[in-house]
Amino acid sequence: LQFIAAYPQVKLELCFEQNIQDVEFGKFDLALRTSIAHSDNLIARYLGRIRHVLVVAPAHPAAAEVRHPDDLRHYRLLSSGETQWVFEPLAGDSLTLTFEPALCSSNYATTHLLTLSGTGIASLPYYLVEEDIAQHKLTLLVPQWQCYPHELYMVYAKQSHYPKKLRDLQHKLQTWCETHSKYVG
């Protein structure tokens, strides 16, 4: 990260919990969230939409059998908290699949590992699985249908003055999202 090189004295702590109060009450300066539900003491700046793809381990039966989102109902679906997937075809109407996850995890990393192990099918961010798809560790399912992307927000506390290092980090995150449209559009 260019930010770490520019600010070697700054301690970065990556926390993969969903507790937005950690930002509101000063434990963290900034959070990345896929929801804008927050208190009036926080600012949520829109960064873009995280591209998601549907993936499965190549040895899983679904890799050869799933041709349409409706086919997913017959398999174990893994979730990172959601119970609905919305699919948009290249042409035509969208389709919503409501499901009861066979397994639900509170973070993408765990869902990713479970998918790699063949536990089931998951909708995961493309940035997380791009290399696995290229190396044939995961198979992309129904590529003619796009999973509805998740909106991404940068959340931080309202203040009268923001330190330069925080402004720089905000700028670098915004720039990264703008220049990596295959992940965040």
PLM regions and their residue ranges:
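Central regulatory/effector-binding core of bacterial HTH transcription factors
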Residues: 1-40
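C-terminal regulatory
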Residues: 22-25, 37-152, 179-185
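Generic non-transmembrane alpha-helical segments
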Residues: 2-6, 172-180
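Solvent-exposed beta-strand sheet faces enriched in polar/charged residues
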Residues: 13-17, 141, 155
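A bilobed periplasmic-binding-protein/Venus flytrap-type ligand-binding module shared by bacterial periplasmic
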Residues: 152-161
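Short amphipathic alpha-helical coupling segments at ligand-binding clamshell hinges
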Residues: 161-175
